[in-house]
Amino acid sequence: SFYDYEFESTFEYSSEINSIVDGVLPDVDSGFPTDTEETKSEPKQPDTKPEQPSVSKPDSSVNGIVPGVSEPKPKQPSGSKPDGSAPGLKPGGGKPEGGIKPEPQVPITNLGSSTSQSSSYISITNLYDILSIIFNLSHIGGTGKGYTDRVSGGVGIGASGGAGGVGGAGGVGGAGGVGGAGGAGGADGASVGAGGGADGGAYGGGYGAGYGGADGGADGGADGGGYGGADGGVGAGGYGGAGGGAGGGDYYSDSSDSSDSDSSGSDSSESGSSESGSYYTGYNNDGSLGDNGRGSSGHRYSDHGSPGNGSPDNGTPGSGSSRYTFSDDGSLAYKSQDNGTPGRKATNYRFSDDGSLAYGAQDNGKPGSGSPRYRYSDDGSLGNGFPDNGASVGISPSIESPGGPVLGSLEDELLGSDSSDEDDIDDGLGGLGLGAGPGGPGGFVKTPKHKPRTDKKKKPDDKPKRKPKTSRKPKTSRKPKTSRKPKTSRKSKTSRKTKTSRKSKRKSTRKTTRKSSRKVSRKTSRKPRRKITRRPVQRKQPREYKQESPEVEREHSAPSTTNVEIYRDIIKILITSLTSSRGDNGKSGDDGSGSGNGGGDDGNGGGAGNGGGAGNGGGAGNGGGAGNGGGNGGGGNGGGGNDNGNDNGNDDCHYDDDDEHRNRCEDDDDYREKCCDDDESGGSGNFDLSSILKLMQGQSGSSSSSSATESESSSTSTTPSTSSLDLSAILSTLSGRSQKTRSGSALDISSLLGVTGSRPSVATSRGSGLDLSAVLSALGGGKPSTGTTVTSKPSTGTSSAPGLDLSGLLGQLGPILSGLLGPKPDSKPSTGSPSTTSKPSTGSSSGPGLDLSGLLGNLAPVLSALTGGKKPTASSKPTAPSTPSKSTGSSPGKGLDLSGLLGKLSPAPKPKAPKPSIGSGLLPGLDLSSILGKLSGGKKPISGSGKGSKGSSRFCRCALSCSCKSIDYGCVNIGCK
């Protein structure tokens, strides 16, 4: 078994570690899922254009963490969302089901021994979620706000007067702007606004926004005003509204007949009349402002270059609408967004002056043709970036939202070549403007999804027009369904998984961990045997450093054992501290409360199951949303209907003692089936992010063994005020510098790298979260290798597509830990003495073992420079004996002796707290200070000296075969064999 093999190795440390673990670290048996738990399915990459409605449960789960996908300019939501999720987390978006989707477990392949892989899985869900919180990885597609930026915000919103209301709704994605247009006619607009707007807001926001900018708006907005995205506006409120409305009726029916818009368009007097203009275009055919200078709700230029619509557009050369316009002279109108030079393509969608394609396939500059989104009048002048062109030819909503198939050829559709009646078309235009109110539903939205669209030949007709709307509505109603379906499937998946894996998992992890912790004496007595078998191997192959060879793996499992064990314990603590306070989680009754749904739909029981949705959390239940108790307390009542089932459940599942409950979850299959969550039985462990946030902010009252004095640190670091974890505070605590933390930033990498002495050039991009690979490679000095899969050997800075490649991260941590441990420096590997130090292959991870000595090698010069040690030669080969310097700085060949560094960095000769500690703000449950103190040779926080190595004084932990002495602020290495 993994732990037996790995941790009962030849090192005196293992017993010490065990005593440390038993004394300090909570024992987490269920923290490490075994391989049986491994999720086989590929992680689902959230679509950039989420087809699932991103209507997420208003619970604390993080939806839509989209690792690498940066969105245009997502605005951080200000304040907390109505659903109570943390400020940085916008609900909605990526994942259809609520709750954290269990990510595939990443096998830690670098634990030193190939046989040990099987049971060493760490749940990425936990670490990844933590990291995503830290780095704000989550892009919640949820609200259109981001797009509002693109839209230039107010465009649609205020623009169309009453429509503005719609637009407002559209607020989503600014699409609203267009929607606003839809809102035509104030009053109507308002109604639309309410319907369209509200919906738009809702869908557009949740949905359209997710769709992404213009296109997103289109789809999302379509539902509500959301259409607005930049262009979406059309479909959204504005268009939908307009078209949908009465006017829409006229417009559609006529246009559906489709007439020779080629001729009729330019002739139409209605659209061109100097007063009316269409509601959208708002220009007369001669280019003068129509409708009292209102211009379209969106953005128009008049021919003479005066602003078409107040703030959004301005025809003067060089100025531009907030969205996309060309200056009259063809110079850039809106920064890099648009450019009128012929053939030049605008970021958004422009035609070049010569009518050639400006933006990919999106638009076509031939006069009178155009994409569903932006139209030209027949004479080739700009119609209205949006739905219609200045001639009377409009675009019927059914035509297409951007990005989807267009029904029939654009020209036929748009120009209505079949149309028999010009007047009809004219009416249509009028309809656009007027109909807006009713149109609100502007159902035109989800066009991309909606099937009728694929019928290319069908000319829009009244019925089809409306049908899309109705068919669209079902879609909206279907949204919840789709979001729910994933959930049920997920539930069955997890239950299947836990069923198959629980027994074996319990057998392996629980037993072995207990064995390793309890039967220390046996373990130590067993050690010599292993020593004997392993050392000869090393002697035989003293020089073989091939990273791939299994012998070498075994050779290095020596050091990695220590590291791994400690690392395992640290991970355990992390996981424990994140998951252990389950009782507290339950208290957040909110999830279950209102409906008793068991924390929203997430209810464990899958409805009735655990207490049923209703009883489940009831809030009151232990599990809170998760509803451990299944309505432990009042859960049963919560559901009302569910009472019976729940009450029974309550009796069975009632427990007063969390530990007892946890044990029963492990040992008693029936009890587990009824009363336990996945994570309680050692499953993939979803946990309540809100509690993690609380933990990270240090708000949770429970701190484990760290007492105030233990974690007292002489350097003052401000605890980060936001939910994001500010590592600079931790680093400043370590380094004894007090740095003011940036409350808003997710992670101040520059200060992180600055402290470690690497180049602080890693830019954190707000949108895409933090690219850890860059950080890791900067720390490790290696080139980030891209594209490695999750199971591949760790190479510095690998990032895998769906989630973080923790193997690389673990690989990075290994050497740091071994450095902290100060493994026995081996200056003469060639003699065959067991090598407990990893070889300094600069910046690259070596094989499956936790050997990233390259990182240590790179850091060593920095550290020795910091500590004033003799600068070691970074190029020293592993086989070349490196003379151990007596100074506290160490050479790359041997393990890093951080004790000197930490001692040097501690401020003042006699600070109150003798050992460097990480500020307790990190995770109250995790007392890294004692671990670091111990690892770095600080005073031993816990009395009782495990088996020490030679020269260890009671409070000073030396590296193996080294002697050291305690001094008032730490430990000094006297010398090593």
Curated annotation (Swiss-Prot):
- Disulfide linkages recorded for this protein, renumbered to the chain, are none
Entry keyword Oxidoreductase: no
Composition bias (Polar residues) maps to 51-63, 309-325, 730-744, 758-767, 785-801
Glycosylated where? Answer: N136
Q: In which tissues is it expressed?
A: Component of the acid-insoluble and acid-soluble organic matrix of calcified layers of the shell (at protein level).
One cellular-component annotation, GO: extracellular region
- Entry keyword Secreted: yes
Q: Where is the composition biased (Low complexity)?
A: 251-278, 572-583, 700-724, 803-814, 822-857, 870-907
User: Where is this gene product found?
Assistant: Secreted
Q: What is the lineage of its organism?
A: Eukaryota, Metazoa, Spiralia, Lophotrochozoa, Mollusca
Q: Where is the signal peptide?
A: none
Q: What is this protein called?
A: Aspartate, glycine, lysine and serine-rich protein
